[in-house]
Amino acid sequence: YEAFSNKELLQVLQVFSGNSAENKEMIALCLIGAYTGMRINEIASLTIDDVKEIEGVLCFEITQGKTKAAARVVPVHSLITPLVLSLREKPHNGFLFYHASITERADGKRSTWHTQRFTRAKRKALGEKGTERKVFHSLRHGVAQLLDRNQIPEDRIALLLGHTRGNTETFRTYSKNAASPVELKNYIELLRYPEIEKGLSINKKSNLRRKTTP
């Protein structure tokens, strides 16, 4: 996968600039992805019970995934805290996202609709040529790059992204127990996207107060 540039990601998000519930849902999903590095199905599967305070820090608690390492706690970035709290206040059958609540598949995936919408928006914003490797998972790739550039220890990046790191189970268990939500929150706060924050008027008071002009 290839990470989006800030400009490219803003162009994709601006495809969802209308005021419809569907556009708002996609913007919210994408912002959570950009400020956490979570997988698209992890985000779509979030319920109100997965957003909780742990040791005084508002976090996403991811309880299931492909591997044992995927189960983890990811602090909520201050810039999307109002957005996340508003989603938690108005759930859809317990889920943060409406289209996840109405998607039931044998494989348990809740993100089918969101994946399709994101792919269409990317093609509309950036075209098809040369963008094949830029998908929703690229947000996760970008988060890993940003954390690495900020010289965050590899085992901490692995904890935040739910990667398996280290040669032994003992190493991972120790790391998980040693990293407090307060420590992890400091790393999450390093994730910043100046062009996107300016283009979408994202701030700590209001995350979806968009400018009317693209």
Show where each model-derived region lies.
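Basic, Lys/Arg- and aromatic-enriched nucleic-acid-binding interface segment
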Residues: 1-40, 140
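Catalytic-site neighborhood detector that most strongly recognizes the C-terminal catalytic loop/helix
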Residues: 3, 66-68, 103, 161-197
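Conserved tyrosine-mediated DNA breakage-rejoining catalytic core shared by Y-recombinases
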Residues: 8, 36, 45-85
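Active-site/catalytic core of tyrosine-dependent DNA strand-transfer enzymes
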Residues: 9, 77-131, 213-214
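Short, basic (Lys/Arg/His-rich) helix/loop patches that form interaction surfaces
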Residues: 16-23, 36, 74, 90-95, ...
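A short, glycine-centered helix-capping/turn motif at helix boundaries
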Residues: 32-46, 150-153
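Short, polar N-cap/turn motifs at the start of nucleic acid-interacting alpha helices
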Residues: 51-55, 152-175, 195-208
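Acidic, low-complexity interaction regions
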Residues: 91, 112-113, 154, 179-214
